[in-house]
Amino acid sequence: MGQEQGTPWIQSTGHTSTQKEEDGQKIPKLEHRNSTQLMGHYQKTMNQVAMPKQIVY
């Protein structure tokens, strides 16, 4: 069961990766904008979660 689920997932990921590369070349601005927004949100969330870790570090 695990192997059956894993095979299509790998294929799907590979296909998406290939498409993403082509899309990225066509519209890098859009992808970059999305990436920046995602990173900002991710950093905000990480800051809240990692704050106690930072103090220990």
Curated annotation (Swiss-Prot):
It is found in: Host nucleus; Host cytoplasm, Host cytosol. InterPro entries: Flu_proapoptotic_PB1-F2 (IPR021045). One of its GO terms (cellular component) is host cell nucleus. Keywords: Host cytoplasm, Host nucleus. It holds the Pfam family PB1-F2. It comes from the Viruses. Residues 18-34 have a biased composition (Basic and acidic residues). The keyword Transmembrane helix does not apply. Belongs to the influenza viruses PB1-F2 family. Is not encoded in all strains, and seems to be dispensable for replication. May play an important role in promoting lung pathology in both primary viral infection and secondary bacterial infection. This is Protein PB1-F2. The gene is PB1.
